[in-house]
């Protein structure tokens, strides 16, 4: 499973999202959309205009959402635990 969190500086929901991923032992990459134009465009192409945007690639499928979603992060943590 590959997880990418598109973030921006001074983003409380971004910080909560990263903290929750850490809490559930999920590894993720962080990309700052204020300095990476391609990442910013990817978020826009997915239909999002606010951070964080989380992109999860697993088993050939891609899931994504915007905002702090602790229930989805917890479910990913449980799923990752099953795969180990």
What are these regions (language model features)?
Residues 35-36, 69:
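Acidic/polar helix N-cap motif
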Residues 23, 38-42:
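Short polar/charged helix/loop
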Residues 58-83:
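Non-catalytic, surface beta->alpha helical segment in thiol-disulfide oxidoreductase systems
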């Amino acid at each position: 499973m590959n997880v990418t969190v598109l973030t921006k500086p001074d983003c409380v929901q971004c910080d909560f999202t990263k903290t929750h991923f850490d809490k559930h032992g999920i590894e993720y990459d962080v990309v700052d959309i204020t300095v990476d134009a391609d990442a910013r465009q990817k978020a826009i192409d997915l239909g999002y205009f606010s951070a964080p945007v989380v992109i999860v690639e697993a088993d050939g499928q891609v899931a994504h959402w915007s905002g702090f979603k602790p229930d989805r992060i917890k479910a990913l943590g449980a799923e990752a635990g099953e795969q180990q």
